[in-house]
UniProtKB/Swiss-Prot annotation:
The record marks R186 as: Critical for target DNA recognition. The lineage of its organism: Eukaryota, Metazoa, Ecdysozoa, Arthropoda, Hexapoda. Mg(2+) 2 binds at D156, D284. It comes from Drosophila mauritiana. It is found in: Nucleus. This is Mariner Mos1 transposase. Mediates transposition of transposon Mos1 by a 'cut and paste' mechanism. Transposases are sequence-specific nucleases and strand transferases that catalyze transposition through an ordered series of events: sequence-specific binding of transposase to the terminal inverted repeats (IR) present at each end of the transposon, pairing of the transposon IRs in a paired-end complex (PEC), cleavage of one or both DNA strands at each transposon end, capture of target DNA, and strand transfer to insert the transposon at a new site. The record marks R186 as: Important for target DNA recognition and for strand transfer activity.
Length: 345
């Protein structure tokens, strides 16, 4: 493979050639990768160009068609965040085919900031802060009457990249805590981890394969699979000694009516969780935070190697690790109440 990397116009000309050879966008992408390496456009970009070719538009130049309405741009960016709100500015810029500075400006205009590795509103409005505060007050009041942390089962999703380069420090304002952000290879393979756990450890997890997503139907089946794992690993629930208290976020696939019906059938109690609150979700502030550091500079060559690494990583964590993640909740609820619902640092 030579060191030559085609520019945008050259790459698009190659795609026209592939299009007329009746190649698919995916096949064309594989040919580009084989010839020029991983710096070529993503499959999604190739698919977008193929759609243009099918409509008869074979112009490979970036033309100004008039600036689209700002709300359209924001909707496009928001759609990417809805798909994966842990993406970096660079990843977002590459998908939108704009500069990283443009994404940074738009995120700022949309009022977004990264908290616990996820993009959330920079400035919560009064109603959002009040909801967070009220929710935490209710949970604290209940906890002080009688602890229920041992009954919490929580879970979430996280992208795992086959190649995760060295973590880079982020730049923050004076007085603000420094953070480190993994900058994975946008063009590399990745798999989505869906994991559920409690104070004693991991109960069940799945790795989604290429093209799979968490929609309502899949999430329903995941809950059924989780329930089966609970019956095997936590017999106290099968004996009805305890009722599951389920903590998950407000993603659309989690709040669909069909999912609510499934949770009701399972007789699980759903713990209140305010929107825009990754700082109050144990998977985000504890499990994934620790996992992210361990994943830095990891390289996987297959789906099976990712699974093997996860099995070993989960098993290497002692009971204290999982216990601590769940039992941090009251302290975080208190801090949220004390700050009138603002984000925790």
């Amino acid at each position: 493979m030579s060191s030559f990397v085609p520019n945008k116009e050259q790459t698009r000309t190659v795609l026209i050639f592939c299009f007329h050879l009746k190649k698919t966008a995916a096949e064309s992408h594989r040919m580009l990768v084989e010839a020029f390496g991983e710096q070529v456009p993503t499959v999604k970009k190739c698919e977008r160009w193929f759609q243009r070719f099918k409509s008869g538009d074979f112009d490979v130049d970036d033309k100004e068609h008039g600036k689209p309405p700002k709300r359209y741009e924001d909707a496009e960016l928001q759609a990417l965040l809805d798909e994966d709100d842990a993406q970096t500015q660079k990843q977002l810029a590459e998908q939108l085919e704009v500069s990283q500075q443009a994404v940074s400006n738009r995120l700022r205009e949309m009022g977004k900031i990264q908290k616990v590795g996820r993009w959330v509103p920079h400035e919560l409005n009064e109603r959002q802060m009040e909801r967070r505060k009220n929710t935490c007050e209710i949970l604290l009041s209940r906890y002080k009457r009688k602890s229920f942390l041992h009954r919490i089962v929580t879970g979430d999703e996280k992208w795992i990249f086959f190649v995760s380069p060295k973590r880079k420090k982020s730049y923050v304002d004076p007085g603000q805590p420094a953070t480190s952000t993994a900058r994975p290879n946008r063009f590399g393979k990745k798999t989505m981890l869906c994991v559920w756990w409690d104070q004693s450890g991991v109960i069940y997890y799945e790795l989604l394969k290429r093209g799979e997503t968490v929609n309502t139907a899949r999430y329903q089946q995941q809950l059924i699979n989780l329930n089966r794992a609970l019956q095997r690993k936590r017999p106290e629930y099968q004996k009805r000694q305890h009722r599951v208290i389920f903590l998950h976020d407000n993603a659309p696939s989690h709040t669909a009516r069909a999912v609510r019906d499934t949770l009701e059938t399972l007789n699980w109690e759903v713990l209140p969780h305010a929107a825009y609150s990754p700082d109050l979700a144990p998977s985000d502030y504890h499990l994934f935070a620790s996992m992210g550091h361990a994943l830095a500079e990891q390289r996987f060559d297959s789906y099976e190697s990712v699974k093997k690494w996860l099995d070993e990583w989960f098993a290497a964590k002692d009971d204290e690790f999982y216990w601590r993640g769940i039992h941090k909740l009251p302290e975080r609820w208190e801090k949220c109440v004390a700050s009138d619902g603002k984000y925790l640092e």
